[in-house]
Amino acid sequence: MKFLLHLSSFIFLLAACAPAPTLATPLPPSGSVLFEDEFDINTTGWDRFANEGGIMDYFEGGYRILVQRPGLNYWSTPEKDYGDVRIEVDLLKLAGPDENRMGLMCRYQNGNHYFFIISNDGYYGIGKFIAGQATLLGQSEMQSNEMIQPNMINHLRADCVGDKLTFYVNFTEIASVQDDDLSSGDIGVLAGSFSQPGVDVSFDHFVAIQP
C-alpha cells in the first residue's frame, strides 16, 4: 500500500509539473490587414541591391525591380509567414519590352513558391516554382486576357487559400487552380525577362489580408 501511495504521489507530481497544452493562436478575422506597405520608407524589409543583373530597391515612393539580363527573374519578400492569405499590389511597367513577367508570389519557402504573373502585352499565368523548375498550373502557356491594361497601372490580387489559388486583375477574377504542394510561407513581388533584357517595373500599395 505504501508503494502504491508513493507511486500515486509521483504520478500526481508529474502531472502537476507537465506543461499546459499550447492553445493554437486564433486567426485574425476575415478582412484583417496582416501587412501593408506603401514603400514610403526604405526600412520595411524588402531587398535592396544592385549588380550587373539588375536592381531591386525602393524608388520614388514605390518598389522597383529592373532586370538587365534576358531569361532572368528577380523576386523580393518582406520576410513574413502566412498560410492562407490574400495579397494585392498595383504595378506599372516603367520601361523595357512588353514581353515581360511581373506579379505576386505566395508561400515562398527556400526558393519554392506560387506565382501570379502578367505581361505588359496582355498575358497572364498562375504557376509554381519548385526545386528550380517553373510550371504553369491549369494552362500549358500564358494566356491573353483583356483585363490586363498595357502601359497602365494594373491592380493584381492573389488568393492563396487551402489548395485553391485564385488570380484577379483589375478587380476581376481571371483564373483559379488547385495545388497542394505548398501550404505556407512568405509573400512578395517578382519581375522577369524573356528574350529581351531591360524589364523595369514599379510596385506600390502592397497589402496582405486575412481571407
Label each PLM-derived region with a short phrase.
Residues 14-16:
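C-terminal motif of bacterial Sec signal peptides marking the signal peptidase cleavage site
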